[in-house]
Amino acid sequence: MRIRSLGEVARLARAGLVRGDASSEIRTAVIDSREASPGALFVALQGDHCHGIEHADAALKLGAAAVLCDPGYSDRHRGASIEAPSAREALSTLAGAIREQEEDQTAAVAVTGSVGKTTTCAMIDAILGSSRIAHAPRASFNNDIGVPITILEAAPETEVLVLELGTNSPGEIAARAEMARPSHGIITEISHTHLSGLLNLEGVRREKFSMLDYIEGDARWAPVKWRRSIGAAASRFRWTGPAGDLEVRRDAPGSVMVIDRLRAREFLLPYDPGPDWLLSCFESALAIVLDFVEDPGQLSEAIPMISIPPLRHEIHCVCGIQLVLDCYNSSPRALKSEIDWLSRSTSSRKVAVVGTMEELGENEDQFHFDAGRHLASAHIDLVFVCGRGAGWLAEGASTGDGQVIHIENNEQGVQQIIEQLQEGDTVLFKASRSEGLDLLASHLETRLIEERGQS
């Protein structure tokens, strides 16, 4: 965001100036007091363990210019303060007003989808970063706090703002898109996720496609397999995937073929995507990037800058064993993609540690059973199951010839897994974040090094 006075920020946020100099400069916004810097607006919100107002003075000591808080909370800190009926809502109001003022100077790319949002954002940011000043979310900042913070913390010189729009319930993406005012948008994937709020696949489709209604122009991208479901409106969109406007196929090892039908050309790029979901993310990222960078040579130079976010197909090699951590989140589509990758691997044995996929609604038992059955059909040699969905997963996985072992807790699980592992194994960890498989994998890695030595 460009520098603005505290008075203007208060007006844009529909807040009132309680204390402080209205002419003081506001350069950014933070919700974590430890990230405060000179000129920052510290937004004091209720957190999981405490209220941000408890850390307002700490933010001010680090240079924060003012605090945005709920009514009456100004008495609980010493510095400049503005109050709004709801600080959380004021944060979104402020970000929306800033975007309205700056949209002509800063393009905004909105990314949503059931799988790969954060990874696609990271890819877009990395590739664009070689030629444009881009700003992307620092993590999965995709809710009513993360999206506005990403907007407000962008440097004034930002040319392309990359935003991740998430959802749990109908209408949330529309609200975030209205605030973000995107010039470009991409739906990475539509599959069974957040069914507790979105109910079914059609609910997911409607919610994701709602983002594209807020984009003027042609830069509305979606997976081609949904083209028929849109009917006559399909001509309003661009499509990724087989026979779509942009398609990316695996080619020789370490490269992909880009079929850019929109511009009537084909070219190779140096990229090894790994599982199918990462290939889809790369395809989605390219769909957006090609509107800014058309030269394949320039793309080839930028691709090595791509860094996949933590716990997304994160590979650790220890003691001759490959540990693959893809446990930031999980869904039927994402799990299938990782199982297929594991099945194609050349490791001596294929091992999967899988746990509950959350927010799958009333049919969650069937989704887990089907995932277990896919483990069986993919000929995974050894399957460990854990969490609330363990029974359903085990039932499906037991339809094959592989061994299935139930894990009761992480401590027991480390011992059970380490007793089975052999040099040359590849071990996939996949579950929703609440299962804590990242911690199990970390403890397993430590034990392997202690007992077998680093190799």
Residue ranges of model-derived segments:
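N-terminal leader/targeting and accessory segments in enzymes
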Residues: 1-93, 97, 344-345, 374, ...
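Residue-level signal for inorganic ion chemistry
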Residues: 9, 40, 59, 94, ...
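Active-site beta-alpha connecting loops in nucleotide-dependent enzymes
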Residues: 47-49, 308-311, 328-402, 452-455
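ATP-dependent carboxylate/acyl-activation modules
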Residues: 111, 310-314, 434-442
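Short amphipathic alpha-helix with an adjacent loop that forms part of the alpha/beta core around
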Residues: 178, 413-420
